[in-house]
């Protein structure tokens, strides 16, 4: 019988001749991480350079499967963030909900960075022509907030947390950061409530893993090795989830053999139980404008968590399936309102980083 250990041992032996290439890939990956996940090295007095740097900070926001489903259009006294529908995920996100949440996350990063560069940003959702987030920028006194400082350190951390609770002050700061107009934030820290959400997460995860279309889409966005991650600059880097970096042909084969419903459900059960709590973001109205607002609120929450040394990760399975989403609403007593995001949080080790495409690739 082919076990995971035997497969890995055989595969590593077979790949021994690729050692030098792997070392090169690791070096390129480390250089890419250092180049992407950083603060600006100099003061930016040139308006054009400052605009590009604002876009760079915006791209450090999270997006579903790290698709980076956005385009940025500078113009006049502001920047518009447009959806890139070529990077949508039609299986896991058929109504483009996560896509517009991602635009909101990028908008919040841009506004936090603009304040640090001496500009006040005001975001407005425009529904015409597929929807966009228009950010007007006006001169202001430069102010580097803790949320801005946290941008290069924020990470969707797909590892275990330490199981320790947060104190009341920390929970209060997270609650304050996650508030938004038309957005409700629920913080679940009681074990009974977390177990109830875990049951819904496992139901959703099971349904998704049994869906071949979901698996095909997920696999499309996995970057199995450093060289692939660096070349494409997007997607879910295998090492970010605690898996080994492998050439795509080998990583793909390993995924097919060992990615299983039981293993994933066991992982989520362990990770919920070693989290300090679960955050649920709820939009008052189920439309793209409010999804964008949820993205902004979540990004503030994630940045505040980062500033506190707290990590976050998504548990969105129960809000990605309509039937389970209704069960989440019923359990939490959400009438009206759409549960948009389910986030676990707690303290834990940093994982290897996902990458980003160059700024030039996202300018419309």
Functional labels for PLM-detected ranges:
Residues 2-364:
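Acidic, surface-exposed loops and disordered segments
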